[in-house]
Amino acid sequence: MGCIFGAFDDPGGRLKTRGPGTTAVHGRREGAQGPLATPIVQTSTFAFASAAEMRRYLEGDEELYLYTRYANPTVRELEEALAAVEGAEAALAVASGMAAMTTAVVSLVQGGDEVLASASLYGGTVRLLTELLPRFGVGARFLPAVDLARIDRAAGARSRVLIVESPTNPTLEVVDLAAVCASAHARGLVVIVDNTFATPLLQRPLALGADLVMHSLTKALAGHSDLVGGALAGPRARIAGARATMKILGGCLDPHAAFLVLRGLKTLHLRVPRQCENALFLARRLEGHPAVRRVLYPGLPSHPGHDVARRQMSGFGGMVTLVLAGGLPAAERFYDRLRLFARAASLGGVQSLASLPVHTSHYGLPEDKLREAGIDPGMVRLSLGVEDADDLVADVEQALAAE
């Protein structure tokens, strides 16, 4: 089966100068003849015309396909688009964000190795590092985000990988990625940056020195809370290693989900700025509210990472975390009184969502890990959608009114 989408055509390298919105809409395709919307190739396997054609596939002809777990035309189109928006040589799309993180780490470590990570990290990643990988002889150590720039002092002889998020989930700490990557590379560490909260529209970790960028496609890149997916982007050689691991682990992305992510990418540059505007508007309104002990948002000058965020990001993101003065009971009462914000896990979609980290992203983690991650029982994580800002503020203020 040949390529049905048209070849990538970029005479003179003109795409290198295109803006992020144009890149999100067009990916790396230019002047391709054929369907404007990417076809969904919903099949498990592909037929060959002859033994000679199969030999061409085995010799590396990328216009031929064998089995969707290995590669699929719709998924490959998404991978090209993801590489374009991240400024990467290549990308790999997989079944979920956790499939992406697991694939990346497993492709880089073996028994006896150690993974270093920020203490403020998504709960699923923490469980991967503390519950699953130790069964196979891979250790993990967690360091405060503020200490990561000195990772060269913390790394040991067994250390192989560093995992960071910026902004972090859900505390919204900002990591100086350029400084951290330089320090990590001084000790030979491979740096994986979870860029889910920032999106490639606001932050380009590869340009700041990261080796691999990871995304939960479920979130802002797809943008509509209707699919689950994940991705890695980076140098071609590292993505090839991750792809070989994915083929064994089996976490391939469904072609229909790939189509939906492609559609979501086309409006990324329209959705994310609106979410950033809504988040900043809400954060400013709530700073100083008597029922709110802290407002965590990198766009506020009071945020400790504000200056770093201004330097390495083009916007501050659509996530705001509140720490309520009354602890978990107050957070649960506030949560129950919300009307516009959906009470749901996940983030980054067009609809605004509210979650309690101790009950969702970090549920079940031991107390010491919660403390290390800076998780307060009174935290409420808000994912701002694209609704009218005044309506969102009114909803939050009415939910806080009784506190």
For each feature predicted by the language model, list its residue ranges.
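Short amphipathic alpha-helical segments
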Residues: 63, 89, 228, 257, ...
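N-terminal "arm"/small-domain region of PLP-dependent enzymes with the aminotransferase-like
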Residues: 2-72, 80
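PLP-dependent enzyme catalytic core of the Aspartate aminotransferase-like
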Residues: 3-13, 130, 139, 336, ...
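Conserved N-terminal alpha-helix of the aminotransferase class I/II PLP-enzyme fold
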Residues: 50-99, 124-131
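Acidic-histidine catalytic/liganding microenvironments
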Residues: 85, 286-290, 338
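Conserved PLP-enzyme active-site core in the AAT-like
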Residues: 15, 24-29, 90-289, 296, ...
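Conserved C-terminal alpha-helix-loop-beta "cap" of PLP-dependent enzymes
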Residues: 30, 294-380, 384
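Short, acidic Gly/Pro/Ser/Thr-rich loop/turn segments
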Residues: 32, 47-51, 239-240, 327-330, ...
